[in-house]
Amino acid sequence: SAQPVRAFTPWVELLSLLLSKARTSAFRDFGKDLDIVHLPRFFRDSQILPDEILLALHGFGGKLRYAGSLPIFELARPLRVSLRLRVVASPLDGPTVFTDASSSTGQGAVVLTARTAPAAVLHVRSHSDVPGFFTTGNALADQHAGHKVLTVREADLHSTLHLGARALSRTCSIPMAVAREVVQACPHCNSAPALSAGVNPRGIAPLDVWQTDFTLEPRLAPRSWLAVTVDTASTVIVATQHGRAN
């Protein structure tokens, strides 16, 4: 977030936050760290960089350059700035395009490029019960972006490895319902008979078959792990405390 955490934040701390945000964005969008980082010129005369800057540059393997002004600013000087209004705050007469622009999912159903006419950008609240044109269109955009656009990679992965629904959901970080749809659409997986649900073995007499599992109970710290053992015949339960689960 760009919101300062204090009323008077040192500029060095703000610079470190900017560096951290730039490196995080580079990893997320390009899969690699920054190649070059430009720092203010007076840092070059310092024997050691401030702790905030060093922390933001931890693990950085690129080049550090010191300059009073970035070279890109020299290229921006001859550019002509257009004062023609391109984005307005109210709807316009023309086509209406809905897109999923959620920052949490990173999905996009529609991308607009090379725009020449003015456009109005509106935010439609999700999960709104108010009926209307914008609510209906936004719901359709979310539905298509959440299912049809996402399942291309998952379908390719399943057609190669034939992963099950649970493994496909964990590998691709998709909902279980979407993973089941991908598996059910595979003709090879549906040709074989489905396995029935498993049944835990049960003893026919006490002390015959036991089942043990670990469960975490934070209130019992420092020995917060419980080894719960059940006699499958008599249903007697025995629980013992442990410091670790192994």
From Swiss-Prot:
PROSITE patterns on file:
INTEGRASE (PS50994), ZF_INTEGRASE (PS50876)
Q: What class of enzyme is it?
A: transferase
Residue span(s) of domain Integrase catalytic: 202-246
- Binding of Zn(2+) occurs at H158, H162, C186, C189
Q: Where are the zinc fingers (Integrase-type)?
A: 149-190
Pfam name, any one: Integrase_Zn
What reaction gets catalysed by this protein? DNA(n) + a 2'-deoxyribonucleoside 5'-triphosphate = DNA(n+1) + diphosphate
What Enzyme Commission number(s) does the record list for this chain? 2.7.7.49
Q: Per its UniProt record, what SUPFAM superfamilies does this chain match?
A: N-terminal Zn binding domain of HIV integrase
Question: Does this UniProt record's set of keywords contain Zinc-finger?
Answer: yes
Q: Which UniProt keywords apply?
A: Endonuclease, Hydrolase, Metal-binding, Nuclease, Nucleotidyltransferase, RNA-directed DNA polymerase, Transferase, Zinc, Zinc-finger
The GO terms describing molecular function are: endonuclease activity; RNA stem-loop binding; RNA-directed DNA polymerase activity; zinc ion binding
Q: Write down the Gene3D superfamilies for this protein, in alphabetical order.
A: 1.10.10.200, Ribonuclease H-like superfamily/Ribonuclease H
**GO BP terms in the entry:** DNA integration
Top-level division of the source organism's lineage: Eukaryota
UniProt key word Ribosomal protein: no
Q: Which named protein is this?
A: Retrovirus-related Pol polyprotein
Species name for this entry? Gallus gallus (Chicken)
**Highest lineage ranks of the organism?**
Eukaryota, Metazoa, Chordata, Craniata, Vertebrata
